[in-house]
Amino acid sequence: MSEVSCKKRDDYLEWPEYFMAVAFLSAQRSKDPNSQVGACIVNSENKIVGIGYNGMPNGCSDDQLPWRRTAKNKLDTKYPYVCHAELNAIMNKNSTDVKGCSMYVALFPCNECAKLIIQAGIKEVIFMSDKYHDSDEATAARLLFDMAGVTFRKFIPKCSKIVIDFDSINSRPSQKLQ
């Protein structure tokens, strides 16, 4: 009888990497040509309770609304129309509420999303990028989070890439239970 390894593999994804990867994978659904942002809401039991990405509102054609960042008229840009990933994750929640949950998000939230996060009862925001740190919107978001007691921190990944290889399921040798 051959001996099957009893030791677990040590290269598995830990929870934080898994949740941030889900946020990044969700971002791939965004049709925005400039910014693809995803968000993943997790409860205290490490269960995903909401996922979202930036996109146009339900029922509004993303072929008819603008995706540009700049124009003479603000109505000809995406900004008055697009729903941010944080909003969509909260609206897509699969539980009665998200009070006390954590949100993993690719980009530090703007002030409008900060208000939604606070009102939803989310207590922690883990973000990957803070590239708009000095903007008024990010400054206001930090102030609101501090006042409401929402903690926020930059995500420090243990690896720089997570590869999804659909062919890998067929390349691993199968093990038969004996």
Swiss-Prot record:
Keywords assigned by UniProt, alphabetized: Allosteric enzyme, Hydrolase, Metal-binding, Nucleotide biosynthesis, Phosphoprotein, Zinc
Amino acids binding Zn(2+): H84, C110, C113
Presence of the UniProt keyword Transmembrane helix in the record: no
Regulation: Allosteric enzyme whose activity is greatly influenced by the end products of its metabolic pathway, dCTP and dTTP.
Cofactor(s) the record lists: Zn(2+)
GO BP terms, alphabetized: cytidine deamination; nucleoside salvage; nucleotide biosynthetic process; pyrimidine nucleotide metabolic process
MF (Gene Ontology): 5-hydroxymethyl-dUMP N-hydrolase activity; dCMP deaminase activity; zinc ion binding
Record domain CMP/dCMP-type deaminase: where: 14-146
EC assignment: 3.5.4.12
Coiled coil spans: none
Pfam families the UniProt entry points to: dCMP_cyt_deam_1 (PF00383)
Gene Ontology CC annotations of this record: cytoplasm
Modified residues (Phosphoserine): S174
Entry keyword Coiled coil: no
Reaction(s) catalysed (UniProt annotation): dCMP + H2O + H(+) = dUMP + NH4(+); 5-hydroxymethyl-dCMP + H2O + H(+) = 5-hydroxymethyl-dUMP + NH4(+)
Active site: E86
Family note: Belongs to the cytidine and deoxycytidylate deaminase family.
Subunit architecture: Homohexamer.
Function of the protein: Catalyzes the deamination of dCMP to dUMP, providing the nucleoside monophosphate substrate for the thymidylate synthase/TYMS. Also, part of a nucleotide salvage pathway that eliminates epigenetically modified 5-hydroxymethyl-dCMP (hmdCMP) in a two-step process entailing deamination to cytotoxic 5-hydroxymethyl-dUMP (hmdUMP), followed by its hydrolysis into 5-hydroxymethyluracil (hmU) and 2-deoxy-D-ribose 5-phosphate (deoxyribosephosphate). Catalyzes the first step in that pathway, the deamination of 5-hydroxymethyl-dCMP (hmdCMP).
Protein name: Deoxycytidylate deaminase
Name of encoding gene: DCTD
